[in-house]
């Protein structure tokens, strides 16, 4: 029996979009039925049958269900109409179990969901590497009326996720509606991993307004501040970020965590190399994160990257995804590989 001391750490929490932007709702909640791959035994082993099934999934149309921005009650809370079903099996609210199993010291996770509204049902699911889903557990809010409250905890092992898969939860509101006040994925980790690390965010820019707006986003995120050591801007443009009309607000938000470094135009690689050099010289942050300047940042992504790095089995490069700025729920690529003999990147098949 192990005598190693452990502590509870938050891995990720339920979040809603900061600005209630309807374009990004699909990244946080899903109002449609899950369109996962049909079980191979139902489709058959014939290639033509598989292709036909995959085409049917791609061509399936939306039911037209909508979520009103006013249903987002806070950064972590969401209101459901009476009898409304809703899934949190989404990019930001599902839990990437297979990645945590493979790359971190975490072996089991606990999901806690806080729901208000009698008769509301929480159901936990998992997906497998082939894409089909399995129901894991469920719970119902007992009592009467819209003020009835339920706090449900589910212990979920990561052992089944050898070759892929996610955990997530769905909620169906009762007759009086429901409010999903929050949810948290936590784990017991070794005591020497109790404290979270900090990060230097390194931004190379020639776009003063866009980079200043990004700095403002980082400074406005109160929950992010304990994780930030320094935000370094390598300013390589003719027009300076400090001259942007957005800069005073950004400077006020970040305070002494902000550092602007003016240098010649050395390209992206030269800018990020300078950021890494300054981070190593300073030596006060656990990690250095390279970030584009022309992006809208979800601050929770930085927190989750730091948390994943803290709990990795070995020192690990933690990558982040990028979405289309003009079609904000469109993911450019879920993963990439580098061919070492030609140093050329490709999307993972």
Model-derived features: positions:
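Long, charged/polar, low-complexity intrinsically disordered N-terminal extensions
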Residues: 1-110
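Glycine-rich phosphate-binding loop signature in dinucleotide/nucleotide-binding domains
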Residues: 279-285, 312
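Conserved donor NDP-sugar-binding/catalytic core segment of glycosyltransferases
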Residues: 296-346
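N-proximal low-complexity "stem/linker" segments adjacent to membrane-targeting elements
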Residues: 59, 70-74, 78-80, 88-118, ...
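Glycine-rich, basic loop-to-helix element that forms the pyrophosphate-binding segment
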Residues: 263-279
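Active-site-adjacent "gating/activation" loops or surface patches in catalytic cores
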Residues: 252-255, 267-269, 343-349
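Acidic donor-binding segment of Leloir-type glycosyltransferases
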Residues: 218-261
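Short beta-strand-to-loop acidic/aromatic patch adjacent to the donor-nucleotide binding site
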Residues: 283-296
């Amino acid at each position: 029996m192990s005598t190693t001391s452990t502590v509870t750490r938050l891995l990720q929490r339920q979040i809603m979009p900061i600005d209630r932007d309807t374009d990004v709702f699909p990244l946080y909640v899903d109002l449609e039925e899950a369109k996962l791959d049909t079980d191979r035994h139902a489709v058959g082993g014939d290639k033509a049958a598989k292709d036909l099934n995959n085409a049917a999934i791609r061509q399936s149309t939306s039911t037209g269900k909508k979520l009103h921005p006013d249903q987002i009650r806070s950064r972590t809370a969401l209101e459901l109409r009476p009898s409304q079903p809703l899934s949190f099996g989404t990019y930001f609210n599902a839990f990437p179990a297979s990645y945590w199993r493979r790359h971190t010291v975490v072996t089991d996770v606990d999901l806690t969901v806080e729901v208000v509204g009698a008769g509301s049902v929480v159901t936990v699911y998992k997906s497998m590497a082939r894409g089909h889903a399995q129901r894991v557990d469920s719970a119902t809010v007992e009592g009467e009326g819209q003020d009835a409250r339920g706090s449900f905890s589910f212990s979920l092992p990561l052992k089944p996720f050898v070759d892929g898969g996610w955990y997530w939860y769905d909620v169906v509101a009762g007759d009086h509606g429901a409010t999903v006040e929050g949810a948290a994925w936590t784990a017991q980790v070794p005591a020497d991993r109790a404290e979270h690390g900090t990060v230097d965010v390194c931004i190379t820019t020639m776009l003063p307004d866009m980079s200043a707006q990004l700095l403002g986003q980082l400074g406005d995120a109160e929950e992010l501040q304990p994780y930030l050591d320094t935000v370094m801007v390598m300013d390589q443009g003719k027009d300076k970020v400090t001259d942007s009309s957005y800069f005073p607000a950004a400077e006020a938000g970040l305070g002494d965590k902000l550092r602007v470094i003016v240098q010649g135009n050395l390209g992206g690689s030269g800018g990020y190399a300078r950021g890494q050099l300054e981070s190593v010289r300073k030596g006060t942050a656990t990690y250095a994160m390279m970030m584009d300047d022309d992006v809208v940042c979800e601050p929770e992504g930085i927190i989750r990257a730091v948390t994943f790095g803290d709990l990795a089995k070995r020192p690990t490069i933690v990558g982040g995804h990028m979405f289309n700025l003009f079609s904000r729920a469109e993911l450019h690529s879920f993963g990439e590989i580098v061919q070492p003999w030609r140093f050329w990147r490709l999307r993972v098949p």
